Amino acid sequence: MLNPDVKTIVDAVEGSQDLFRHSLPMIASENVTSPMVRKVLSSDLGHRYAEGQVGHRFYQGCGFVDVIEGKAIELAKEIFRAPHVNVQPVSGVNCNIAAFFALADPGDKLMALAVPSGGHISHAKFSAAGIRGLKIYTHPYDNQIMNIDVDRMIKQIREIRPRVVMFGASLFLFPHPVKEAREVCDEVGASIVYDGAHVLGLIAGGQFQDPLREGADVVTGSTHKTFPGPQGGIILCKEKFAKDIDEAVFPGTVSNAHLHHKAGLAITLAEMKAFGKQYAAQIVKNSQALGAAMDDLGFNVLCKDLGYTKSHQIAVDVSKIGGGSVLASKLERANIITNKNLFPWDDVNTTDNPSGLRLGTQELTRLGMNEPEMKEVAKFIKRVAIDKEEPEKVKKDVVHFKSQYQAVKYCFDGDGAYEFSLR
């Protein structure tokens, strides 16, 4: 018989497992790992430390860890064609903090997207950029194309002369103008950091854009969104920044790198080497198919004239049918898991119920769904959002539909997306 406190926790863990077994997971910042990755996450590595770099550790007993981290670095260099790789950060925000410490000093200027325009919180004064003491200026943004205004950006870089120009976003429909910024950044002495957290798997699979080839000096990213690995971070950079990046990671911002996650990352890198091109291509196809299907059903999907998206995300303005928070809550009752999202025209004080829904297809794709399934998903959302059906009624059909998608695809051992037991 379980201890009552332990039982409370075990019940909640199993409840969450069961929820997602029967739900449509459409949070754009999540994914599901392969069974092999889940196995190594529960290995003895989760008990161990390995401070330092491969071959230069401060503790004994790290020989196998060196093999694992060395293989992860080798695979990442190959997949991303990166001169230098650091796999030790424990999150995407950790990566950004390390990049800011490596490339800038307190009081230096940073250009990044505003949060309502899709910028991540770590690019703002109340998170990583503020921790480094950077003065933050926001990219000029074109609401019509949901992207940075290139001409105004170039002008602003010349005027402000920032130390770091940041690209990347949490609402990220289209590639950012890295190539267009490179020349003017060289002119003013600015480094380019590309936060690829959301699109790292797309980049690995040859989709979306190739920031290192387009002119980025440093690419940061989390490893658990379109890149379907365990939660963690990775930094890719040009060789000239390698020493500063490595020192900003250790001893700067990481002590122990969560070794079980690095083993999972290495396996996911092997999966992406084998299956990444097909996976990334299907994600983009599914996103565009979902956007078209929802548009056909009467939703206000942004950027129709641009094909809705080139990433794993679509953005839907639901301000006239309840707002993002209200609708996300209703969809959750139907086992459709989404999130509300600020849009550029929203007041920052409307975070409780902003205009938008952000929908991601990367996890549905990982579970084997293709374009025809996106039409079915769109119909489920319409029944709740537009037809005003009781969510609990729609839930029954969602559960039946999801029962057909219970295995992880684009990996070596795809059975059992939700196999799990604590009792």
UniProtKB/Swiss-Prot annotation:
Quote the subunit structure annotation.
Homodimer.
Matches recorded under PANTHER family? SERINE HYDROXYMETHYLTRANSFERASE, SERINE HYDROXYMETHYLTRANSFERASE 1
Part of which pathway?
One-carbon metabolism; tetrahydrofolate interconversion; Amino-acid biosynthesis; glycine biosynthesis; glycine from L-serine: step 1/1
Q: Which reaction does it catalyse?
A: (6R)-5,10-methylene-5,6,7,8-tetrahydrofolate + glycine + H2O = (6S)-5,6,7,8-tetrahydrofolate + L-serine
Q: Which organism is it from?
A: Methanocella arvoryzae (strain DSM 22066 / NBRC 105507 / MRE50)
The coiled-coil segments of this chain are: none
GO biological process terms on file: glycine biosynthetic process from serine; tetrahydrofolate interconversion
Top-rank lineage group of the source organism: Archaea
* Entry function: Catalyzes the reversible interconversion of serine and glycine with tetrahydrofolate (THF) serving as the one-carbon carrier. Also exhibits THF-independent aldolase activity toward beta-hydroxyamino acids, producing glycine and aldehydes, via a retro-aldol mechanism.
Q: Please list the residues that bind (6S)-5,6,7,8-tetrahydrofolate.
A: G119, H120, I121
**Entry EC number(s):** 2.1.2.1
Q: Which cofactor does it need?
A: pyridoxal 5'-phosphate
SUPFAM superfamilies in the cross-refs: PLP-dependent transferases
What protein name applies here?
Serine hydroxymethyltransferase
List the InterPro entries: PyrdxlP-dep_Trfase, PyrdxlP-dep_Trfase_major, PyrdxlP-dep_Trfase_small, Ser_HO-MeTrfase, Ser_HO-MeTrfase-like, Ser_HO-MeTrfase_PLP_BS, SHMT-like_dom
